[in-house]
Amino acid sequence: MHPDNIHKDSYDFEALTESNPQLSEFVFQNKYGTQTINFANPEAVLQLNKALLKFHYQVENWSIPKQYLCPPIPGRADYIHYLNDLLSEENIQGEIRGIDIGVGANAIYPILASRIYDWKMLGTDIEEKSVAIAQANIETNPTIAKNIEIRHQEDRGSIFKGMIKKGEYYHFSICNPPFHASQEEANKATSRKFKNLGLEKGSALNFGGQANELWCNGGEALFIKRMIKESVLFKSQVGYFTSLVSKKENLPKIYKHLNKLKADFKTIEMGQGNKKSRIIAWKFD
């Protein structure tokens, strides 16, 4: 985990439950004598996120409905910190502006970017309901509302088109693309998680997420390919284009597309516990 990430150490559940008393009913002591929660329980994770956002980032009344993706905040914060490292190399003067592709109902990247570094953020999403929920989460917090704008992407075939307006400039784009290539693939992945946890199918688990959050035709690799192709059209309006890459085996294809377009790119490795992922960042001269 990034050295600047305040979540790199274990959770202080005493402070977190004081911040959000509803979390206390989900906290227990594991066999090692450490306080924890059941991370497979979506309500427990939701209450943990509420506590983390309130205690560390002074964000109140954040919430998302059931079946929406409930993000792990430490990992999302890591992406923001590594982005800051990337931008620090650019010697940027003045305020920093970024665009989040697929902001979701949780709007977690803009929220963290605003609270950690005071960046100005634009969040976009193809789901109108997600946009409304994200907007509600932001409007209840004046400290972040001044920094964040949410736009609905009405054209499902476009990523940047229609979202980046004439005359606008963003120092970076950020994206956590849909992971799976189909609903069937997403269902199989969920079944494997049930099996690994030794739970019956149908249990309440934190494997939520709307279809557009979990999968798209072609999965992560094709989505990033589309993003790379469209990014050329906005090379003068975005400094660094970036995306999370969860599947390492997708990197060779991504590199091929970037080389074809003569992009300058780099891969930033990230790790949270046993989970390994990376950011692909590219720009055009």
Swiss-Prot record:
Q: What class of enzyme is it?
A: transferase
Q: Which UniProt keywords apply?
A: Cytoplasm, Methyltransferase, rRNA processing, S-adenosyl-L-methionine, Transferase
* Subcellular localization: Cytoplasm
Its Enzyme Commission number(s) read 2.1.1.181
Chief location category: cytoplasm
Query: What are this entry's molecular-function GO terms?
Result: 23S rRNA (adenine(1618)-N(6))-methyltransferase activity
GO cellular component terms listed in the entry, alphabetical order: cytoplasm
- Provide the catalytic activity annotation: adenosine(1618) in 23S rRNA + S-adenosyl-L-methionine = N(6)-methyladenosine(1618) in 23S rRNA + S-adenosyl-L-homocysteine + H(+)
For whether the record's keyword set contains Cytoplasm, the answer is yes
GO biological process per UniProt: rRNA base methylation
In terms of Gene3D superfamilies, this protein maps to:
Vaccinia Virus protein VP39
What this chain does, per the record? Specifically methylates the adenine in position 1618 of 23S rRNA.
Concerning its family, UniProt says: Belongs to the methyltransferase superfamily. METTL16/RlmF family.
Q: What is this protein called?
A: Ribosomal RNA large subunit methyltransferase F
